[in-house]
């Protein structure tokens, strides 16, 4: 069976991408990172998701890119966005170079494990301000993969697959349900804690999609109340 490395953060998008890789016939190898994020709740979710999907190989890598700051996801002194992302602006939750570092390490793992694909949960719709979630970024990295590795120069570079890149969050929820993703086990909240906050921008986008898709029971109580107040 062909292998695929899946970048698994523990969030809904990465979990759905992992499930898609399995549905596409790959043996999935999960890769998660301790990069200095505010909390480890998402890594606990990654473990749970990997187990639920039957992923046997799961690598955790320490790469503390948070130590030089630059993001509200890694710097507790910076407030988390909670009122929506301004169109055309890069959100404060962008972590400088994060996807570039992660995908580079995924390429290393894929080559070592002879994996023919790398599945990414990146999305260019809900977070269109992120420069490293765009199709042209992905295409450029694919070219780099072909030039920077032994398998690449031999014409067998792993294919970067981003099945959700053009999906709206509600479409991702629907796909996740079809693929059997354990949605309640995933974690998208920017804050840590026993339960998702329901206030940060990530929670709001997720809650709105869950409710629109017909699964309000998986949304936060705050998210359900906010939707009920809308005209």
UniProtKB/Swiss-Prot annotation:
Taxonomy, superkingdom: Bacteria
Pathway involvement of the protein, from the record: Purine metabolism; 7-cyano-7-deazaguanine biosynthesis
Names of required cofactors: Zn(2+)
EC top class named in words: ligase
Cofactor binding mode and count: Binds 1 zinc ion per subunit.
UniProt keyword Metal-binding present: yes
Sites where the protein binds Zn(2+): 189, 197, 200, 203
Pfam families from the UniProt entry: QueC
EC number: 6.3.4.20
Keyword Nucleotide-binding part of the UniProt annotation: yes
Binding site for ATP: 8-18
GO biological process, one term: queuosine biosynthetic process
Function according to Swiss-Prot or TrEMBL: Catalyzes the ATP-dependent conversion of 7-carboxy-7-deazaguanine (CDG) to 7-cyano-7-deazaguanine (preQ(0)).
Record-stated family: Belongs to the QueC family.
PANTHER family: 7-CYANO-7-DEAZAGUANINE SYNTHASE (PTHR42914:SF1)
Identification of the protein by name: 7-cyano-7-deazaguanine synthase
Organism, scientific name: Synechococcus elongatus (strain ATCC 33912 / PCC 7942 / FACHB-805) (Anacystis nidulans R2)
Name of the gene encoding the protein in the UniProt record: queC
């Amino acid at each position: 069976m062909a292998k695929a490395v899946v970048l698994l953060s523990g969030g809904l998008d990465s979990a759905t991408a992992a499930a898609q890789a399995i549905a596409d016939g790959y043996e999935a190898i999960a890769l998660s990172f301790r990069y200095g994020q505010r909390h480890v709740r998402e890594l606990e979710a990654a473990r749970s998701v990997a187990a639920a999907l039957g992923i046997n190989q799961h690598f955790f890598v320490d790469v503390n890119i948070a130590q030089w700051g630059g993001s509200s996801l890694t710097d507790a002194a910076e407030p988390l966005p909670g009122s929506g992302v301004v169109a055309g602006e890069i959100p404060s939750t962008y972590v400088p170079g994060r996807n570039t570092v992660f995908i580079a390490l995924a390429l290393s793992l894929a080559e070592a494990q002879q994996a023919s694909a790398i599945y990414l949960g990146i999305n260019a719709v809900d977070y269109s301000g992120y420069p490293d979630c765009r199709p042209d970024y992905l295409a450029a990295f694919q070219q780099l993969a072909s030039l920077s590795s032994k398998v690449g120069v031999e014409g067998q570079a792993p294919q970067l697959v981003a099945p959700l890149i053009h999906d709206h969050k509600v479409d991702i929820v629907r796909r996740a349900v079809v693929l059997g993703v354990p949605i309640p086990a995933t974690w998208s909240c920017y804050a840590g804690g026993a339960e998702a906050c329901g206030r940060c921008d990530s929670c709001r986008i997720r809650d709105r999609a869950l409710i629109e898709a017909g699964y309000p029971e998986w949304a936060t109580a705050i998210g359900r109340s906010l939707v009920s107040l809308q005209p």
